[in-house]
Swiss-Prot record:
Cytoplasmic side: 165-181
Domain TM2 intervals: 146-194
Protein's UniProt name: TM2 domain-containing protein 2
Keywords: Glycoprotein, Membrane, Signal, Transmembrane, Transmembrane helix
Record's subcellular location: Membrane
Major localization listed first in the record, in broad terms: membrane
Pfam name, any one: TM2
Signal peptide annotation: 1-22
Extracellular side: 23-143, 203-213
GO cellular component: membrane
Membrane-traversing stretches: 144-164, 182-202
Lineage: Eukaryota, Metazoa, Chordata, Craniata, Vertebrata
Length: 213
């Protein structure tokens, strides 16, 4: 069949070629657009936060309270690493000069335990607004040195006459006296049992009982 001097099959072939060329051009444009968007996303930083280059590449300068990036000091405990409380060993002057730290450790009731600030830092790979190192307040002045209440109570009950419980807790002087008197003929042994149960006999280094989970 001939239409206007041109075979219909020839016209259809030209149309298919034009469609194929159009599809190729469209695919090329889409590919270039996708590549540009991917590059732009790498350069973007959250609104209100300027990205820092160098070692602190996962930090931003905090400038906008509406930014999705929070200050590092607002991170939950599981995303930060904190130092142990500073022990000033009763030196009040050193505590005042530094501005934080513990004068004493330990305590049974909450009101007996001192609280202080400690140095914390955001974990590697956590993105937050700088500074990445900060002070976190209200940390209890307690430490653990491997003393377990149940173990010490068993020592006191079965071997208390020989002062094993006090040796274990670091009270060496009174432990020797308890050993030489065989637990004060049983009186000292009984008194130490009561003191352990009521919290009157604790480790000599001011540490708390380790918790058994």
């Amino acid at each position: 069949m001939v239409l206007g001097g041109c075979p219909v099959s020839y016209l259809l072939l030209c149309g298919q070629a034009a469609l194929l060329l159009g599809n190729l051009l469209l695919l090329h444009c889409v590919s270039r657009s996708h590549s540009f968007n991917a590059t732009a996303e790498l350069d973007l930083t959250p609104s209100g936060a300027a990205h820092l280059e160098g070692p602190a590449a996962s930090s931003w300068e905090y400038s906008d309270p509406n930014s999705p990036v929070i200050l590092c000091s607002y991170l939950p405990d599981e995303f930060v690493d904190c130092d142990a409380p500073v022990d000033h060993v009763g030196n009040a002057t050193a505590s005042q000069e530094l501005g934080y730290g513990c004068l004493k450790f330990g305590g049974q009731a909450y009101s007996d335990v001192q609280h202080t600030a400690v140095q914390c830092r955001a974990l590697e790979g956590i993105e937050c607004a700088s500074p990445r190192t900060f002070l976190r307040e209200n940390k209890p002045c307690i430490k653990y040195t491997g003393h377990y209440f149940i173990t010490t109570l068993l020592y006191s009950f079965f071997l208390g006459c020989f002062g094993v419980d006090r040796f274990c807790l670091g009270h060496t002087g009174t432990a020797v006296g308890k050993l030489l008197t065989l637990g004060g003929l049983g009186i000292w042994w009984f008194v130490d049992l009561i003191l352990l149960i009521t919290g009157g006999l604790m480790p000599s280094d001011g540490s708390n009982w380790c918790t058994v989970y």
